[in-house]
Amino acid sequence: MIKEYKTLWSIPNNIGYFISSNEQGHSHDQYKYANFSFKVGDRENSVQSNINDLKNLCSINNIAFMNQMHTNKTRELIYYKNNTNTDGIFTRNKKIACAVLTADCIPLLVTDKLGSFIGCIHAGWRGLKSNIIENFFDNIRFSKLSDLRVLIG
């Protein structure tokens, strides 16, 4: 279901990331096997089972999924909150993982060389046109631009 690709991205040891596949999971038919979206018509219990499996594999209880709207909105998560209406989230809270779902959009994962935060961006053409990436970087000014590490999926 998930694969760890540490070699693709030079990041601090306190940061982990995973890229999921559709090879295993509880979803069926057109939703493949490991669907994590409640918005596409898959059975809710299948999606929740897939999310629970992901939490177990990653050993984390709080995975924050965005309610991706194809906008330029970004938000910092100080406390765990799921389904925030945004297309970019970041957190400095070590007990929260950030998740981005894509089909034909581009996922970006962001941290800095110290691993002081983790974030992700859902970049579709509407978000790119309305400066989602610029808005995200405007919200993480606590980290120097030269210290940032970005993985484009």
Tell what function each PLM region has.
Residues M1-I19, E23-Q24, D29, N85:
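Conserved nucleotide-ligand handling architecture
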Residues D29-A34, E76-I78, N131:
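Short, glycine/acidic-enriched capping/hinge loops at junctions between secondary-structure elements
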Residues Y17-D53:
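Intrinsically disordered, low-complexity, positively charged segments
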Residues E44-I121:
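Phosphate-centric recognition/catalysis
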Residues L109-G153:
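Glycine- and Gly-Pro-enriched alpha-helical subdomains that act as flexible
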Residues F18-S20, A64, G119, L151:
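Hydrophobic/aromatic beta-strand patches that form the interior of the parallel beta-sheet core
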Residues K32, N62, D104, S146-L148:
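A generic structural signal for short beta-strands and their flanking turns/coil linkers
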Residues N14-Y17, Y33, I63, A97:
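A residue-level signal for beta-strand positions that form part of recognition/binding surfaces
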